[in-house]
């Protein structure tokens, strides 16, 4: 059903409402500061016309749910579904584009957003700040599926920082986009879940993507009511989750505990391998494992004073043991000039023959913290902090 109304940015008048007296839905949005008076053709209820913005695997799950809803003719939730994604150097494109093409959905590459008419926009892992002019094209605004319990972990990498900081509880927030600032709009729906012990960021993202997709469909089924009941984010508890840089992957053996190193590995290991120095050469640690108690009982590990970064090969378990601030971590494989197992690394660099005949100083035969050159990004950092305050 379509109705022609004179409105100020928000849902149409409720059925039976008197002219000149705004509906509860409109009043809720007006309190949130949206004003763009014009004549427009909008819908009071589903099916909705949706424009989806997304890029990665997390976003693809939300798009899959929207597509399934559009194909479900009995529920009549989605009438029209089109997609905006980012350009990619890969011919196949990003995961969202791949799914859109396979599903024969119209797809545009940013900044092209098409010229169709839509009721509501949906964003998931898009990575671009949407301007006010674009947001105001959607009668019901633009929703964001964000994988954290806002206001904790605003920004582009919430799942990574959830794992990196050892959070035990996380969740998904469906919020409404605001122009000029990231992740600060009103919360329409929020659900929490425990973080599975020792889960990687990739594994946690898969859990949250399914939860977020289900929550999105729930919000769309009652969109005007959800908007009317939206609540502002609290001021306290806001944290920022910046993108991960190569410098984050550099292990600080003297400063980081074994727990911190394992959290770092679970958070970013599948994106950027952890890095350190070996005899002035960068070495990547590919496969980290926890060290069991039987290995720790070895006299070689307890009978001498060790410097953080010291490396010992444990023959029985075929792993490299590396000493950090408070204990040991295990490494099964590394990348030097090529990929090496722990045994290969021992034979090439730790074997007594090599230690005897090498010109390397004993102090060099340990892992040392890699110091990458830092770029001056102070202005950008300040600007990003202002975006979330």
Curated annotation (Swiss-Prot):
It is linked to Combined oxidative phosphorylation deficiency 15: An autosomal recessive, mitochondrial, neurologic disorder characterized by features of Leigh syndrome and combined oxidative phosphorylation deficiency. Clinical features include mild global developmental delay, white matter abnormalities, ataxia, incoordination, speech and reading difficulties, T2-weighted hyperintensities in the basal ganglia, corpus callosum, and brainstem. The keyword rRNA-binding does not apply. Changing residue 209 to L: In COXPD15 and MC1DN27; decreased methionyl-tRNA formyltransferase activity. Belongs to the Fmt family. The gene is MTFMT. It catalyses: L-methionyl-tRNA(fMet) + (6R)-10-formyltetrahydrofolate = N-formyl-L-methionyl-tRNA(fMet) + (6S)-5,6,7,8-tetrahydrofolate + H(+). GO terms for molecular function: methionyl-tRNA formyltransferase activity. Methionyl-tRNA formyltransferase that formylates methionyl-tRNA in mitochondria and is crucial for translation initiation. Keywords: Disease variant, Mitochondrion, Primary mitochondrial disease, Protein biosynthesis, Transferase, Transit peptide. SUPFAM superfamilies: FMT C-terminal domain-like, Formyltransferase. Its EC number is 2.1.2.9. PANTHER family: METHIONYL-TRNA FORMYLTRANSFERASE (PTHR11138), METHIONYL-TRNA FORMYLTRANSFERASE, MITOCHONDRIAL (PTHR11138:SF5). It is found in: Mitochondrion. This is Methionyl-tRNA formyltransferase, mitochondrial. InterPro entries: Fmt (IPR005794), Formyl_trans_C (IPR005793), Formyl_transf_N (IPR002376), Formyl_transf_N_sf (IPR036477), Formyl_transferase-like_C_sf (IPR011034), Met-tRNA-FMT_N (IPR041711). GO terms for biological process: conversion of methionyl-tRNA to N-formyl-methionyl-tRNA.
